[in-house]
């Protein structure tokens, strides 16, 4: 009986708190609608720190999120970006469990920010760090997917491709690459767009996405005749490579790389990626040097990070340094 009454009182208290937040929101919204942007912004900040000091983290986060959306709708980029950062601060300090809804909210804020603003760069960096939640150093794959789709819509294909690499959306990546190749690439390089993506997915030990991106891209690209086999030797190499990865036989991998050297010489990075793939899938011992150097080192260190130990699903479980652009 006492427990039931306590629970009922708690529910009433929660309802009162929510009602109070809604009343405050109404006043702030009216202030923004009147054009009192500076005053409204300062009030949002004051309420944020007041709620946080009272451990009302959810109320603080929800108020900042709705406020950011309101400022974005009035083209107040600076105020909106500031409140977006406070949303992140509430998540970081409250140690909130990562959920798809929260990731969608963060992606929504990202999509509304000025693509050229420094605040956007800072926001996405912190958002990815928070979303990793200790389960991976690259950020949550779902957040990467949301970011990739937003950047794709903005026709920022280069950055979109990076985030697709760290998502599990091989199909989305392929569709973006088809558009990227068709609108920005040379017809003679249609095979190189997907070859690079497949090799980089494999360097991340993500066999599933590597296979999906290859199949989807080759089926949907208007300049690629249906295969296999394909007209382009490089596509045949990638097709055979994906089969070899499943089999895990070093002799097959070695012969394959030797036979297709003319195609692999089209990009100096291909053989570097294949060295890494040989280590991951075919038991090839790593080179003598303890770390990669030169151009490969820069690329691989940006793709895989510094090599902390992480238990991540298909795509990110090995910890040798590789970070790709």
From Swiss-Prot:
Top-level taxonomic group: Eukaryota
Q: Where is this region: Disordered?
A: 1-22, 306-325
Looking at the Swiss-Prot or TrEMBL record, what is one Pfam family this protein matches?
Answer: GET4
Transmembrane annotation, as ranges: none
Q: Which GO terms describe its cellular component?
A: BAT3 complex; cytosol
> Can you state the subunit structure given in the record?
Component of the bag6/bat3 complex.
Function description? As part of a cytosolic protein quality control complex, the bag6/bat3 complex, maintains misfolded and hydrophobic patches-containing proteins in a soluble state and participates in their proper delivery to the endoplasmic reticulum or alternatively can promote their sorting to the proteasome where they undergo degradation. The bag6/bat3 complex is involved in the post-translational delivery of tail-anchored/type II transmembrane proteins to the endoplasmic reticulum membrane.
This protein is called: Golgi to ER traffic protein 4 homolog
Q: Which gene encodes it?
A: get4
């Amino acid at each position: 009986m006492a427990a039931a009454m306590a629970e009922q009182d708690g529910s009433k208290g929660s309802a009162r708190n929510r009602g109070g937040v809604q009343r405050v929101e109404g006043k702030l919204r009216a202030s923004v609608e009147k054009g009192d942007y500076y005053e409204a912004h300062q009030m949002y900040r004051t309420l944020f720190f007041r709620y946080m000091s009272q451990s009302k983290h959810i109320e603080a986060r929800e108020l900042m999120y709705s406020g950011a959306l309101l400022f974005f709708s009035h083209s107040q980029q600076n105020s909106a970006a500031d409140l977006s950062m406070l949303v992140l601060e509430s998540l970081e300090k409250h140690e909130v469990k990562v959920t798809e809804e929260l990731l969608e909210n963060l992606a929504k804020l990202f999509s509304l920010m000025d693509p050229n603003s420094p605040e956007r760069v800072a926001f996405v960096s912190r958002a990815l760090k928070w979303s990793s939640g200790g389960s991976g150093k690259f950020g949550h794959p779902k957040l990467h997917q949301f970011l990739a789709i937003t950047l794709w819509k903005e026709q920022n294909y280069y950055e979109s491709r990076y985030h697709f690499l760290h998502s599990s959306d091989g199909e989305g990546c392929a569709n973006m690459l088809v558009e990227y190749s068709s609108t920005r690439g040379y017809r003679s390089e249609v095979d190189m767009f997907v070859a690079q993506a497949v090799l980089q997915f494999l360097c991340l030990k993500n066999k599933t996405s590597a296979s999906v991106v290859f199949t989807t891209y080759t089926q949907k690209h208007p300049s690629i005749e249906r295969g296999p086999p394909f007209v382009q030797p490089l596509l045949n190499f990638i097709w055979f490579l994906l089969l070899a990865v499943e089999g895990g036989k070093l002799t097959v991998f070695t012969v394959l790389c030797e036979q297709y050297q003319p195609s692999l010489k089209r990009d100096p990075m291909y053989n570097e990626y294949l060295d890494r793939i040989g280590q991951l899938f075919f038991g090839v011992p790593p080179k003598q040097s303890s770390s990669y150097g030169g151009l490969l080192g820069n690329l691989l260190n940006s793709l895989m990070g510094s090599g902390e130990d992480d238990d991540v699903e298909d795509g990110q479980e090995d910890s040798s340094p590789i970070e790709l652009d």
